[in-house]
């Protein structure tokens, strides 16, 4: 398992050897024995330099959250999945997980260049390290897909998930809006399939930041009018 790498050390090593490092396995990827991990593009690399390079890559048996945001999301989603299992049936816990996922996704949604590759450059702006990285849509899908599937028949879950996505659509960078809208479309399809012939279909279509029982959403102009009337 590629657990972590020394970003600053890798850039310094590559600059010192006038090289470009291309990682074939990202942080969080399982690395099978004998699998190439990194390509070194340089005119000449001494053997001692290779040993130093390997010392900047942490391989182990478990993923870690320090450089692997997807694993942090995975842990939260697993908690929600267990809560939504037939044996537990605890949609409130799943809704609380969505609260924390919302916070994480809002932070990611304001982060530029979540486009599949991380480029680390030296002080002169020369690209020195290229690493596979998650796209925003990958992380969003990881955060919501399984909860949507396992919580498809829970009004509390689908309402909280709708609120999460609608809020996120307003907060993310323009280049990520399409990914959020795609997840909203998937949620619509899920609700139609799960609640199409049920009496609670209308409730399932309402966004609620608390899942069930939350206050209605108000816009600033509505608040001003209400204040003036009082």
Regions flagged by a language model, labelled:
Residues 1-19, 26, 35-37, 41-230:
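Short basic (Lys/Arg) and small-residue
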């Amino acid at each position: 398992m590629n657990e972590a790498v020394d970003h600053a050390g890798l850039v310094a090593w590559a600059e010192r050897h006038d090289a470009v490092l291309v990682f074939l396995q990202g942080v969080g990827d399982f690395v099978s024995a004998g699998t190439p991990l990194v390509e070194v593009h340089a005119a000449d690399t001494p053997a001692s330099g290779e040993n130093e390079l390997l010392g900047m890559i942490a391989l182990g048996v478990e993923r870690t959250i320090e450089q692997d945001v997807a694993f942090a999301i995975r842990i939260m989603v697993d908690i929600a999945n267990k809560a939504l299992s037939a044996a537990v049936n605890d949609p409130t816990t799943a809704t609380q997980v969505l609260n924390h996922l919302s916070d994480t996704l809002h932070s990611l949604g304001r982060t530029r260049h979540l486009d599949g590759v991380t480029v680390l450059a030296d002080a002169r702006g020369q690209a020195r390290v290229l690493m596979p990285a998650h796209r925003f849509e990958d992380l969003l899908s990881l955060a919501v897909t399984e909860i949507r599937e396992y919580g498809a028949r829970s009004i509390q879950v689908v309402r909280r998930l709708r609120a999460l996505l609608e809020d996120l659509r307003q907060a993310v960078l323009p280049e990520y809006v399409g990914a959020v809208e795609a997840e909203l479309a998937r949620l619509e399809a899920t609700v139609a399939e799960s609640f199409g012939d049920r009496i609670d279909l209308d409730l399932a279509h309402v966004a609620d930041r608390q899942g069930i029982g939350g206050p209605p959403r108000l816009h600033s102009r509505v608040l001003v009018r209400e204040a003036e009337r009082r």
